[in-house]
């Protein structure tokens, strides 16, 4: 019985740790990310037609939620002709995440 309790505790502790996303203050983000946050607060309009599309969280770096919970928005990158690698991902619960390396890492935005 003790083994089973320890096993389940380790399993749940590991899954919770996987969702420990570092935080970043909104004021320390690049200017373009702060502009995207302002657009999100005002409801747009957004410059890219892909903005607002479902982010699938296939990388499983954010807390697991049902499909459609997360939406992604482009953060302009000066000097880049395409959308670049920077995004803000927004959860339906009001949480915001920033990635500057095309979903390899995330930081939760504190506003």
Question: What are the residue ranges of the model-derived segments?
Answer:
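N-terminal secretory signal peptides
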Residues: 18-63
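Bacterial N-terminal signal peptides that target proteins for export
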Residues: 1-7
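N-terminal signal peptide c-region/cleavage motif recognized by signal peptidases
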Residues: 13-15
């Amino acid at each position: 019985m003790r083994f089973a309790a320890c096993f389940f505790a380790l399993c749940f502790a590991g899954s919770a740790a996987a969702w420990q996303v570092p935080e970043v203050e909104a004021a320390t983000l690049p200017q373009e990310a702060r502009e995207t946050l302002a657009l999100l607060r005002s409801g747009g309009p957004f410059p890219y037609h892909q903005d607002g599309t479902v982010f699938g969280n296939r990388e499983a770096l954010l807390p697991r939620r049902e499909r459609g919970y997360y939406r992604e928005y482009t953060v302009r990158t000066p000097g880049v002709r395409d959308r670049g690698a920077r995004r803000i991902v927004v959860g339906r619960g009001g949480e915001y995440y920033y990635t500057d390396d095309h979903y390899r890492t995330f930081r939760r935005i504190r506003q």
